[in-house]
Amino acid sequence: MDNLRGVAGLAALAMLAMTGLMHAGQIRDALEPAASTVRIASTQANDALRLAMGGQGGQKSAPVAEPDPQLAMTTDAAGRLRDKIPADLYPYFDVYLYVSKAAEGALAQHLYIFHKDAANNLVYEENFPVSTGRERHERYFTSTPVGLFELDPNRFETSHYSRTWHARMPWAMFLNATIHGKQTGVALHSSGNAHAVLLGNRASGGCVRLPPEKAAELFHRFQKEEQGMVPVFAYDSTHNRTSGDGLIVRDSSGNPVLAPGYRVLVFIEDYPGGPALVAVVA
């Protein structure tokens, strides 16, 4: 999908800001008073919103009759993040990656990037096609795991080689998780030129393949800008894996146990995308 551009893009972002603010109000009601809320916002969106609503004496402009499909998808992805992430995780992460591993649908096989600004607003950056697992039995079941994940600070590799698939995994950023009792081999990494044509389809052995230029960009960005102390995710013995719901380890005083990592939170789910949202400025 192309990024939002020009006046149409600003109007779309304005409606996105309105939607985010409504969700933020709901979040505030649900969370404890001291908790920060996260909503969709941007300076451009606020400027466009003022233009759309009219700046003179509260006068309003003509209705916007055609909602932007990109807006609907971005709002949907942001809403899924808001609903999934526990409030006590927000202070520890700056970048949020949403991945839909669905085979079909508006959000399917795409990664959406959001970052948190100084006011704790969740700001949309961009989205692009990816390839997740083929979801079938091969050498093993080629499934991409779902849930909330941190990135493993000890497994950022510019050129990893998979002995299982006898394939290179450039710019590999492994998930920091134990699944089925062992450290996962699932990573976000470059598709490489040979598999780039398959982006937007289920095509991997379980990893999340990214466009080559995006994999390199995120790899360097996270290493340069996002290192910090993050919560240690708890182990879910019922499902024999690291918690995918964002449950964290706490000490005897109830404080989160922190460890060096990346302030990046990844949410992967099998969700195709909801119906198009109708947003009208009346």
Residue ranges and their predicted role:
Residues 17, 97, 218-221:
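Generic hydrophobic, helix-prone segments enriched in Leu/Val/Ile
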Residues 53, 99-101, 132, 267-270:
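Surface-exposed beta-strand edges and flanking loops
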Residues 75-195:
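Gly/Pro-biased beta-strand-loop elements
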Residues 157-282:
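Exported/periplasmic cell-wall-interacting domains
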